[in-house]
Amino acid sequence: GSSHDLSYDGTDFNYPSALMYAGRASGVSPYHLATRIIQEQGRKGQGNSISGTVSGYEGYYNYYNQGAYKTATASAVVNGLKYAAKTDAATLRPWNTRMKSVIGGAIYIGSRYINRGQNTIYYEKFDMVTPYTHQYMTNVLAPRSESSTASQAYSDTTKKNTALVFKIPVYKNMPDSACELPTGE
């Protein structure tokens, strides 16, 4: 259960029903939305971007951390909440309720990424569609982490009995052997 207020348009939602609603509104898989929120806010949903208590941005929420990047003058959380506080009717901003952030952020993901060809976690991070100028996330390991989280949402039976389609980019002029994984910073 959750003590978070997820009411919207006269209806009270829990997180599963909120994500189903957001998925229908955006054309984005509710599983994808759930894994993105877990990636951005943690499994227990304790991220500051959804606390509603950040000084100067009380009552604003940014479940998917859109517009959240660190600068010399502001943290990623503050920049994300600045974004959440702006007005944009298409994405239900300002995100001054949890549900407006969940639904509006999903609409943003759908319209800006999923429904225009960047329709895998990999393509959201590594933009091979535009090309190269339109990435969703800064964390290079996010696609790996999100795909692992998404896999855990399905039972072993479902995974064994469901046909999966993989979109795998093929790069030209690559070296014969793979580079070692980076370590540290």
Which residues make up each language-model segment?
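Glycine-rich, acidic and aromatic/proline-enriched surface loops and short helix-turn segments
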Residues: 1-3, 39-43, 107-114
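Short, functionally critical alpha-helical segments immediately adjacent to catalytic or ligand/cofactor-binding
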Residues: 20-45
